[in-house]
Amino acid sequence: MSWLRSSPLRQSGNGGGGGVSTGHSSTGSLRQRPIDAATDCDPRACYDSFCKHWQQAYDIIQHYAPPTHDDVLGVVSHLDYMVTLLLVELHHCNKVSLPSTDASAAPAAPCLEYLLSENLLDKLYEWACTTGRYANAVRLEQLKLYELLVSHSRHQLLCHEPFLRPLLKILASSQGEIFPPDLEKRLVILLNQLCVVLMQNVHLLDLFFFSAQTQVQEQIQNGNVPPPKSGTTTNFIIFSLLIPYVHREGSLGHQARDALLLCMALSQKNSNIGTYIAQYSSICPLLVTGLGGLYSRLPNSIEISSIDWHRITPDDVTEIPELTLFMNALEFCNAVVQVAHEMIKQQLLDFMYQGFIVPVLGPAVLQTLKGKHFQTNIDSQISAMSYLDLILRSITEPGLLRAFVKFLLDTEKFDGERILDSLVERLNSPDANLCMVTMALFDTLLGLHCEDLMLELLLKFMLPGKHVPISHRHKINKIDPYLNSSDFFLELSPDVLKRARDLARPKSVHEQQPPSGATGEQPIQPLAWPSLPSPVMSKTIGANWNYYGLHTGDSLYANLQAYLFEAHWRIAQCQRDCLKWANSYRYQKWPRHGQARVHAHALELARQFFSEFGGGPPAIASESAGEKQLDSLQSIGESSGYESFKWRPADEESDATDLTVTTTTTTASEADLEHNSSSISSGMGGGGGAAAGRRGEAWRISHTNRNELLLTDLDFSEDLFAQGTVSLGPFLNAIWGKLQTFTSNSLYVNLHLTGLITRLAWYPLPLIHSLLLRSDIAITSDTPSFHQVLRILKQQIDAELPVTEDSLEIIDVARSSLIDREFRLVNARKGNENSPLHHHQQPQTTLSQQQQQQQGQQRSAYATLSAATPVQATQTSAYDPFKRSDNKRKSISKSISSMFSRRSTPNPPSSAGAASTLVGNNNSGSGQSQPFSSTGTGTCETSLSTNPQSGAAAARSTGTATTANGNSSNSNISIGGSTQTLSGHSNTTTYSSSTLHGLDGGPQTGSFNSEPASLDSVASMGIIASTSGTERTRDVALCAVLLDEWLKELAAIAQEQSVVLVTDQLL
């Protein structure tokens, strides 16, 4: 019931009504009543006054002539006094006492006793029906009276016919009527209170189910209401009256939706209500059509105020009224699916898919016209994808998430074209904003931990195992190579970054120290590095390195412990979600049962192949004959890329593995190898020897120990005879393509890109690990492998940034700018506009704007970063990791706990400054929270668009806190990323995904490539102008710093994944 908790109605109501406004607290038009003077009043005097006022009102009611204005005003005035006296009496009684059977006992509430015994409410209703044009005024006073009695008497009065009968009459007469706003407000408040009472007393539900025919026939005889238009025999009057207000704005709409949700929750307890709502009410079509109408009112183009904007944040929602209404309707639908009866839930999901998702959302995302041509309006595509991303981050109910996943994979509704394929194509868009929004959307999709999505994006291309050579497949489940991969990633750090760390790290005790007076001498350098004259001490990290090589300042830069903690937490979360999958998608050993028959069948296939190509069955032949025949089989065309057929020694036989996937959706078209005992959809992809022979593709076999070759130990499959390489699918091809242009991309695209790959590495799937984390496994895809791309990037950066003094200075400035940006985003997240850093940057901001205009709008990602005063550097660090008396020392465990706590509103952690710093630089779809790391998350986000004149950074969070290495967790989004295992939000909500981008951008120009200005660009021009090197060199320096931090993160993930494998094997 998250909808009920977040309703504004809860803020205005008092504590006694369960969050629902009471009559006296929520009715501003009600006169001020002497509630506090109740104890000073004589109960007998109150009773006499009450009777007198009613007698005077009743004298007016008994007039046969049509009531005049004075008559109505007199009755309303007397009723107002009667309400006052009733309120005084009810406050005087701690508990309402109903009429007692003991005649000698004085009633505890004599006024209320008189009201019920004399049937005053029924008489008042009968007279109100004759008031003509004054009916609304009298009805308003009646509703006030009922509201007061229901709020104070709770459920006791509903059991008495003198109260219930006129209440049902006035509610029935309100159906189909159009009332003024004040009357609508009273009616909705009364209905809300009735729903609360019924929720607490389910046995009273049947009182509000009545036969429409019998009830209305009686009212028709009295001349009260017209006959019903529909032929239904039952009616839940409260629910029917609330339906017209479901899409209303403001507090009236919130109260109506609250009451409707209570009715939906009641349907779980009473099947009659569920049947009525599903079969006889129009709530589901009304919700869906209203949602489609509200979506059509959304802006076709979103104003982008920051160069790194990539997704819609909660603050953006509140700033766009149309988007606020749409999100209210969407969240209400999500809440209905969460609490309603199964019949209502299924009906709403069907209407949502057929009435909103496919006809409304589909064309908007595809951006198609009548001629089925794509629009060239990039802004429309950006806004549509941003809305889709917001929807996926907002809904948390698994059933609703499944409907959206089905929408992405549906091929029948859009003429054979899948939405998911169109989204993948946009990853290659040359437009930076569209590319970032697309990657943010894919970060949200990956954060769902949905098996179907992962199967379509990655696994169906990897399941055949053709990307891994046969001789390497037995390594997939081994543990040791993961540890080696950690070293591999750390070794790929650019040389200039390694040199900078060596210079910044304090010398150990055993190192030789130079003489204190020899200031002009060169310091002792490692043998691997050339000696440099007078190296510049790093300004950004020199003061914050301790003797353990860990960064211990307020920034989380180079904090390996934070990377390890984050990797452990994210991998564990992903593993829990993936446990719900139908298949494990892991390499497994040959099944013991029926193994002999499987081997015999494979041997028979091999003999068929040799018979067709060699004229005989040479499965077991002499060594000479085998060499002569096999050596003559040369490859037709290029080599397949696979290593030679390799026999497995006896000691490795137990490690021989094969991919056995018990799924019907993976390789149905590829698995031609079937047995009576088992069906193997192997890593080879099936295929018989005859089929392979028809391809006529050659293969080679090692002639070493050929007599000892055991065909049954081979991963026999058609890919052994396949020519060329295989594709890893359009998604990975697009990601690898972006990664190959890493040094040419903008900083923000790289942040999203690295975060997206990091999210993939969190999955507990050895198949994905073979691509990302296993440097010892060769990949035979049609594009360079991930590790090859990383090596190429290292070579590019080393070539453009050699280890020189100028390069070290540029690296230091890049690092200082990114860390300063990190601090600024943290301050913005905390709403700390009065921080010393903020005040210090104000004059520099004005100056940098003038310089920026004079320098002709330099378009560089480096130029968008602020370069405020760097951290003061010292030659050595006095930091003691075991010092407990330092008040400024922050507890990582405490910080992490506070960051992981769920909050309904953006609540920046006050005590976790160090642990939440990297969050400021959240990666948009990747959820990466460090300016240098690419950690991704699905639920936390920041809005990074700011006004440069105000200098205030608006950092927004969706309700999930940030982790130690800067990642944010979803709930929810929460947005709950959901989450996210189809648990919305799953839990990642996620609130979540995190936007890792800062407040960056240059001033706006009229050109096509111009980008909006933001806070980062206005504070960096001074130090950039004084920095040596070209613009390209500075951009490469930013890429080098980002790549260095990302490699540390990948090393941490590889190490933690190995720990997970060890734990799984031990268990």
From Swiss-Prot:
Ranges annotated as biased composition (Polar residues): 1-11, 859-878, 918-949, 980-996
Composition skew (Low complexity), residue ranges: 842-858, 893-904, 950-979
Mitochondrion as UniProt keyword: no
Region (Disordered): 1-31, 503-525, 832-1013
Keyword DNA damage: no
Residue positions, PTM Phosphoserine: 508, 835
Alphabetical UniProt keywords: Phosphoprotein
UniProt-listed InterPro entries: FHIP, FHIP_C, FHIP_KELAA_motif
Domain of life: Eukaryota
Protein family (similarity comment): Belongs to the FHIP family.
Official protein name in the record: FHIP family protein GL19323
